[in-house]
Amino acid sequence: MLDLFGASSAPTFGNQGKFTTDPVTGALIPVVVEQSSRGERSFDIYSRLLRERIIFVTGEVEDHMASVIIAQLLFLESENPSKDISMYINSPGGVVTAGLAIYDTMQYIRPRVSTVCIGQAASMGSFLLAAGEPGMRIALPNARIMIHQPSGGARGMASDIEIQAREILRIRKRMNDLYVKFTGRSLDEIEKAMDRDTFLEAEEAMKFGLVDKVFESRPATDSVGEGEGSGGAPA
């Protein structure tokens, strides 16, 4: 449910015990019920948080999921092009092209996108985490971050396999160059770290340059970003 135009009021779960079902996974999703002078309105929890400019990147990064994330980014830009967006990431990674589509949209829109790692950010998940607005990339203390080079399988004639191998190498170079941009590390350092699976704890990821802050609790004051639209730590 993506109903974002309800009346402003305090949301409550109450005693209704209402849930909706995720159409993809079948998982139960809590429903928030709002009371207003115009009556009662219900939102699934993710739609309610989207009204607060919070987006979730969870599970495998693939084309359908990427399309949903991109649509939310574009919608929030249309709502307010100068107000920050918070992106919470808990993902094992996935398809490179799907992740790059999300990344390009993050760069394309006008609002700044703060990224927050909860749980894990591996492979393309770590890429999106590092791609957040500089100074606004956050990991919670028990988050795990993993980086590695892209992988893929090739089948068919030898010439087709050769073409696909060249494409993977080209993607690897592009990814390495972007990680250099995100982290400030040298290309040699990035290539070495990306050669195999490299797992990092939150503090290690901060030292490496993948995130800027490790927060155990939400700061009471604005300590993350400055300027118009800044809300400090993510909402």
Curated annotation (Swiss-Prot):
The keyword Cytoplasm applies. One of its GO terms (cellular component) is cytoplasm. CDD domains: S14_ClpP_2. It is an enzyme of class 3 (hydrolase). Keywords: Cytoplasm, Hydrolase, Protease, Serine protease. It comes from the Bacteria. The keyword Membrane does not apply. One of its GO terms (molecular function) is serine-type endopeptidase activity. It is found in: Cytoplasm. Fourteen ClpP subunits assemble into 2 heptameric rings which stack back to back to give a disk-like structure with a central cavity, resembling the structure of eukaryotic proteasomes. Cleaves peptides in various proteins in a process that requires ATP hydrolysis. Has a chymotrypsin-like activity. Plays a major role in the degradation of misfolded proteins. This is ATP-dependent Clp protease proteolytic subunit. The lineage of its organism: Bacteria, Pseudomonadati, Pseudomonadota, Alphaproteobacteria, Sphingomonadales.
